[in-house]
Amino acid sequence: MLQPARRKYRKEQKGRNTGVATRGATVAFGDFGLKCTDRGRLTARQIEAARRAISRHVKRGGRIWIRVFPDKPISTKPAEVRMGNGKGNPEYYVAEIQPGKIVFEIVGVPEELAREAFRLAAAKLPLRTTFVSRLIGA
């Protein structure tokens, strides 16, 4: 699963996920992409599950790019622990997603195969997504 190799600080504040994606909003590497139209978080497990779904469907064909990286630690306190006594330990990592962000890209497969692979991947993700293709001549 994806997670940072090293971090300067183990824990991070919650923050707010606002605005729309300006970087990473166009298909840059492949021919087809899976674009999120919702705002939210993708965990490393969700990204990996979607990647496996795409890989299994396209079999040996095509090249896949993961355009997001889960670099934000989410901390939780253990069950039945009283409030206070500091912040909990980091449990997992998430990628903050703004509307318009491309999550996956693929090249080397027909459009119908890419659509079906991304449909299977979208079922693993908690956000609404749409299929996009590269603009010809751009």
Swiss-Prot record:
This protein's UniProt keywords: Ribonucleoprotein, Ribosomal protein, RNA-binding, rRNA-binding, tRNA-binding
Renumbered residue ranges of the record's region Disordered: 1-20
Entry-linked NCBIfam families: rplP_bact (TIGR01164)
Quaternary context: Part of the 50S ribosomal subunit.
Protein transport found in the keyword field: no
GO cellular component: cytosolic large ribosomal subunit
Similarity comment: family membership: Belongs to the universal ribosomal protein uL16 family.
Amino acid composition bias (Basic residues), ranges on this chain: 1-13
Source species, domain of life: Bacteria
KW Ribosomal protein (keyword) present: yes
InterPro entries recorded: Ribosomal_uL16 (IPR047873), Ribosomal_uL16_bact-type (IPR000114), Ribosomal_uL16_CS (IPR020798), Ribosomal_uL16_dom (IPR016180), Ribosomal_uL16_sf (IPR036920)
A molecular function (GO) term: tRNA binding
UniProt name for this protein: Large ribosomal subunit protein uL16
Function: Binds 23S rRNA and is also seen to make contacts with the A and possibly P site tRNAs.
Gene Ontology BP annotations: translation
